């Protein structure tokens, strides 16, 4: 695991300029953005430090994962305010066996994924509806172009971990299943769009609706 983390750090540093080239955030006219209500004189190195990846990166991948579902730990400007105006962000993605990151898009950035541990099947669909897929091994990288619908799937019986870099401090996330079936679009509209019936649409919606809290 130590060698995997070393590889992760080296390639993350190398990939950072690539993410910046693809950046789409507005330029700023200062060195960095001071949060509202903060005094510049009180800012220290702590402001430019993010420690939220310590737990996922220290996980023993040979042991059962504490969460049976796909999880993501983000370092965007929401979690790491120093990224505001810097046109870069990261995420650690954890895939227990037989889990996936469902089809989704990032409207404001491409995604550069580095597989640190395990194996993944990934893919995206371009604007001509052509599907591009690849099976990744640890150490492989894959780029999902900006705005394209894409996914990652761990079909094996071992966990996988990846690091994703984005050319935006807030790349955004649009989940295709939730956006289509979880936003109260009329059942008749969806049934006609997918050439099916309303009961089928209602079943799909039910599967994406969180259970009511007691």
From Swiss-Prot:
Which positions are glycosylated? 42, 60, 69
User: Which keywords has UniProt assigned to this entry?
Assistant: Apoplast, Glycoprotein, Manganese, Metal-binding, Secreted, Signal
Q: Does the keyword Signal apply?
A: yes
Give the GO cellular component terms, alphabetically: apoplast
Q: Which Pfam families match?
A: Cupin_1 (PF00190)
Molecular functions per Gene Ontology: manganese ion binding
Please list which residues make up the signal peptide.
1-23
State where it is primarily located.
secreted
What family is reported?
Answer: Belongs to the germin family.
Q: What protein am I looking at?
A: Germin-like protein 9-3
Which lineage is the organism of this entry classified under, starting from the top rank?
Eukaryota, Viridiplantae, Streptophyta, Embryophyta, Tracheophyta
């Amino acid at each position: 695991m130590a060698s995997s983390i070393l590889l992760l750090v080296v390639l993350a540093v190398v990939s950072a300029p690539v993410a910046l080239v693809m950046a789409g955030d507005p330029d700023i006219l200062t060195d960095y953005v001071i949060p509202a209500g903060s005094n510049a004189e009180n800012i220290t190195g702590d402001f430019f430090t993010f420690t939220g990846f310590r737990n996922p990166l220290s996980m023993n991948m040979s042991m059962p994962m504490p969460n049976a579902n796909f999880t993501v730990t983000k370092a965007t400007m929401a979690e790491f305010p120093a990224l505001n105006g810097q046109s870069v962000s990261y995420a650690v993605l954890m895939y227990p066996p037989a889990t996936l990151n469902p089809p989704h898009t990032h409207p404001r950035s491409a995604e550069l994924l580095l597989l640190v541990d395990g194996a993944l099947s990934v893919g995206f669909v371009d604007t001509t509806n052509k599907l591009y897929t690849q099976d990744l091994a640890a150490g492989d990288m894959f780029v999902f172009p900006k705005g394209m619908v894409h996914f990652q799937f761990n079909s094996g019986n071992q966990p996988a971990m990846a690091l994703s870099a984005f050319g935006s401090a807030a790349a955004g996330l649009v989940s295709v299943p939730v956006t289509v079936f979880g936003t109260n679009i009329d059942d008749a509209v969806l049934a006609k769009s997918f050439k099916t019936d309303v009961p089928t649409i209602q079943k799909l919606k039910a599967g994406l609706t969180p259970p009511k809290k007691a």
